């Protein structure tokens, strides 16, 4: 009856890794967009 873990445990484990990956992808996207808009 305890199939679902508390949300706090989920955030402490999977969400932390996902957050790191999302932040890295976001900054990579921003860097690519910034470079793409620089005058050549």
UniProtKB/Swiss-Prot annotation:
**What positions does the entry give for a bacteriochlorophyll binding?**
19, 37
**Location of this chain's protein in the cell:** Cell inner membrane
Transmembrane segment boundaries: 21-40
Q: State if S-adenosyl-L-methionine is listed as a keyword.
A: no
Q: Which UniProt keywords apply?
A: Antenna complex, Bacteriochlorophyll, Cell inner membrane, Cell membrane, Chlorophyll, Chromophore, Light-harvesting polypeptide, Magnesium, Membrane, Metal-binding, Transmembrane, Transmembrane helix
Q: Which GO terms describe its cellular component?
A: light-harvesting complex; plasma membrane
InterPro entries associated with the record: Antenna_beta_dom_sf (IPR023624), Light-harvesting_complex (IPR035889)
Instruction: Read off the SUPFAM superfamilies from this record.
Output: Light-harvesting complex subunits
Q: How does it sit in the membrane?
A: Single-pass type II membrane protein
On the Cytoplasmic side, which residues?
1-20
Tell me where on the tree of life, at the top rank, the source sits.
Bacteria
Q: Which GO terms describe its molecular function?
A: bacteriochlorophyll binding; metal ion binding
Name the job this protein performs: Antenna complexes are light-harvesting systems, which transfer the excitation energy to the reaction centers.
Q: Which family does it belong to?
A: Belongs to the antenna complex beta subunit family.
Quaternary form?
The core complex is formed by different alpha and beta chains, binding bacteriochlorophyll molecules, and arranged most probably in tetrameric structures disposed around the reaction center. The non-pigmented gamma chains may constitute additional components.
Recorded protein name is: Light-harvesting protein B800/830/1020 beta-1 chain
- UniProt organism field: Halorhodospira halochloris
Q: What is the lineage of its organism?
A: Bacteria, Pseudomonadati, Pseudomonadota, Gammaproteobacteria, Chromatiales
């Amino acid at each position: 009856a305890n199939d679902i873990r508390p949300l706090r445990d989920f955030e402490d484990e999977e969400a932390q890794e996902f957050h790191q990956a999302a932040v890295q992808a976001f900054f990579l996207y921003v860097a690519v967009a910034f470079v793409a808009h620089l005058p050549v």
